[in-house]
Amino acid sequence: MVVAADLRSEVGKIAAEFTGRVSVSANNLTTGERLDIRESEVFPALSAIKLGIMAELFYRVDAGDIALTDKVTIKKSDLRLGTGVVREFETPFEITVKDVCMMMIVVSDNTCTWLLSDMAGKDNINARMRSLGLHEYSLNSDLGADTFDEMAGKDIDAYSVCSSRDFTNLVTRIATGELVSESASAQMLDIMGRCQHIEWLGRYLPLNQFPTEMGVPPTYKLHNKLGAYLHGRCDTGLITGPDARYVITVMTADTTDPTLMLCEHEGSRMIGRISKAIFDAWMGFD
């Protein structure tokens, strides 16, 4: 069995090989063990910041201000650059709030992110995170119409920043049914479990990527949200299996690797290697 000190040493050695900065925060919900390395340091949060937008949406739903079944009309002026598929659709069209949230997380759709951040309010989202004790989380832009012009020439933290500790604590609340309500947490976890990009935290793990389609209950399951742009890569999520259930966040920045964001990259490999080391230790594969 890998003891905490040995695991920390192993993860530290892996992180030391990176050309930039690496931050790790992992919380074993089965044993109570934590592993933290540079966990309070602020990193570009990129699209992982969308978890906080989803959280505030569910708080608003719980308060009765919004219903997941409400319809919103997406207009041409709402379309945003970057990741997602909605910008390719003919406008105007109607869609439910739940489906907007689903696309924001599952395919990281920026148009849907704009709609929900505008609906919830950027300042409200940040204030909610502060109320939860997440002080490094900061959504700096709501993806308004001028966002990409405003970010031109700036570093990627102009959009969003967070610490690995804050992300792990946020996902822990979701995983334990403590964010908003048990029902809301379950719905958020279900959405995260549909994320189509599992190849960073899940890169070296024995995951079945299409269990529903194959009709096979997954032995190991990842519920996550990643982010990528320029020199930054990050991934945060819950990993479950027969022997453990844990939350893990790995954030990287300032790499010298110039590769495009969803291609093979030093940051995504680093996330995968650290994830595998923690998986082996906490799932008993050592």
Predicted regions span which residues?
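Beta-lactamase-like hydrolase cores
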Residues: M1-E41, A277
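Structured C-terminal helix/loop/strand segments within mature extracytoplasmic catalytic/sensor domains
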Residues: V2-G12, M119, L170-Q209, G215-D286
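Sec/Tat-exported extracytoplasmic proteins
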Residues: A15-F18, Y59-D65, K76, I105-S108, ...
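Extracytoplasmic
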Residues: T19-R21, R38-S40, A48, A67-T69, ...
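Active-site SXXK
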Residues: G32, P44-V72, F167, I248
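Acidic helix-start/capping segments at beta-turn-to-alpha-helix junctions
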Residues: T69-G84, A120-G121, D146, I191
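Conserved catalytic neighborhood of penicillin-recognizing serine enzymes
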Residues: L79-L116, K122, G153, S160
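Mid-domain, small-residue-enriched loop/turn segments at the edges of structured enzyme/sensor domains
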Residues: S117-L179, S183
